[in-house]
C-alpha cells in the first residue's frame, strides 16, 4: 500500500533531525517551511537535505545584490546572538572577497527558512508541524529558568501556540503535531504540569495528540 505524501512545517528546525526521522520511517514528505535563526544549522540543513554544495554556491546565477542578501538575512534575525543580545552583522560581507553572503543566503532559500519564529504572522498550511523548541532553560545542563513566555528562550514554545491559534482562525490547522525536547520536560513537577496543560490546549485545536 502506497504511503501518501505529507507536507511538513519544521519549527526550530536545526539540522533537520525531525524530517530525517519522518523519512527514515518511510513516509514521503515535502517541507513547506523551516524556521531557525542559527545560521550554521541552516547551512547544515541545506547541505544535508536540500543539495547545497560549494559547486552550487559558485554556479548559482540568481543571487540578488549583496546589499539585498544582507538585508533579507538581517530581517529574519538569522545568526542572532542571544548571549550578546544583538543581530549578526551580515553587512560586513557586502564588500568581502569571500562568498559568505551567497552561501548563507542560498542555504536559507533552499531550506525554505523563515527565520525568527517570533516575527512570523502565520504559517502556510502543512499536514504536520514539528517543533523542537530550545531546551536552554529546562535541561540539566542549562540555566533552569523555565518556560516563561517572552522571558526565556524556552518560552519560545508559546510562539507555536500563537501560530496555532492563528491557523485555527484561518481554518488551516495541521493534522499532526510533534514536540521533541529533553526528558526532564516530563520529570520536574512544574514542567509536567505545564506540559499536561499544553497537551490540553493542543487537544482543543488539533486532531492527533499522543505522548511518546
Go through each PLM region and give its residues.
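Conserved active-site and SAM-binding loop architecture
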Residues: 1-212
Amino acid at each position: 500500500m502506497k504511503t501518501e505524501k505529507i507536507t511538513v512545517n519544521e519549527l526550530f528546525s536545526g539540522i533537520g533531525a525531525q524530517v530525517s526521522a519522518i523519512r527514515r520511517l518511510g513516509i514521503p514528505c515535502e517541507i513547506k517551511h523551516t524556521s531557525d535563526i542559527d545560521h550554521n544549522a541552516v547551512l547544515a540543513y541545506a547541505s544535508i537535505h536540500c543539495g547545497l554544495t560549494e559547486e552550487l554556491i559558485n554556479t548559482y546565477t540568481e543571487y540578488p545584490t549583496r546589499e539585498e542578501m544582507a538585508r533579507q538575512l538581517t530581517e529574519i534575525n538569522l545568526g542572532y546572538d542571544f548571549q550578546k543580545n544583538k543581530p549578526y552583522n551580515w553587512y560586513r560581507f557586502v564588500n568581502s572577497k569571500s562568498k559568505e553572503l551567497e552561501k548563507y543566503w542560498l542555504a536559507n532559500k533552499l531550506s525554505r527558512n523563515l527565520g525568527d519564529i517570533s516575527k512570523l504572522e502565520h504559517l502556510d498550511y502543512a499536514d504536520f508541524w514539528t517543533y523542537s523548541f530550545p531546551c536552554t532553560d529546562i535541561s540539566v545542563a542549562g540555566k533552569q529558568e523555565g518556560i516563561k513566555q517572552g522571558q526565556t528562550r524556552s518560552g519560545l514554545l508559546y510562539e507555536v501556540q500563537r501560530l496555532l491559534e492563528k491557523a485555527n482562525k484561518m481554518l488551516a490547522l495541521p493534522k499532526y503535531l510533534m514536540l521533541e525536547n529533553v526528558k526532564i520536560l516530563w520529570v520536574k513537577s512544574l514542567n509536567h504540569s505545564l506540559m499536561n496543560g499544553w497537551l490540553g490546549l493542543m487537544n482543543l485545536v488539533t486532531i492527533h495528540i499522543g505522548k511518546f
